[in-house]
UniProtKB/Swiss-Prot annotation:
Reaction(s) catalysed by this chain's protein: N(6)-[(R)-lipoyl]-L-lysyl-[protein] + pyruvate + H(+) = N(6)-[(R)-S(8)-acetyldihydrolipoyl]-L-lysyl-[protein] + CO2
Regulation of its activity: Pyruvate dehydrogenase activity is inhibited by phosphorylation of PDHA1; it is reactivated by dephosphorylation.
Cofactor entry: thiamine diphosphate; Mg(2+)
Subunit annotation: Heterotetramer of two PDHA1 and two PDHB subunits. The heterotetramer interacts with DLAT, and is part of the multimeric pyruvate dehydrogenase complex that contains multiple copies of pyruvate dehydrogenase (E1), dihydrolipoamide acetyltransferase (DLAT, E2) and lipoamide dehydrogenase (DLD, E3). These subunits are bound to an inner core composed of about 48 DLAT and 12 PDHX molecules.
EC top class named in words: oxidoreductase
Protein name (Swiss-Prot/TrEMBL): Pyruvate dehydrogenase E1 component subunit alpha, somatic form
EC number in record: 1.2.4.1
């Protein structure tokens, strides 16, 4: 996807 922040947040969880 184009949402890099979403991927980072998911990993942060």
């Amino acid at each position: 996807x184009x949402d890099a922040t979403f991927e980072i947040k998911k990993x942060d969880l």
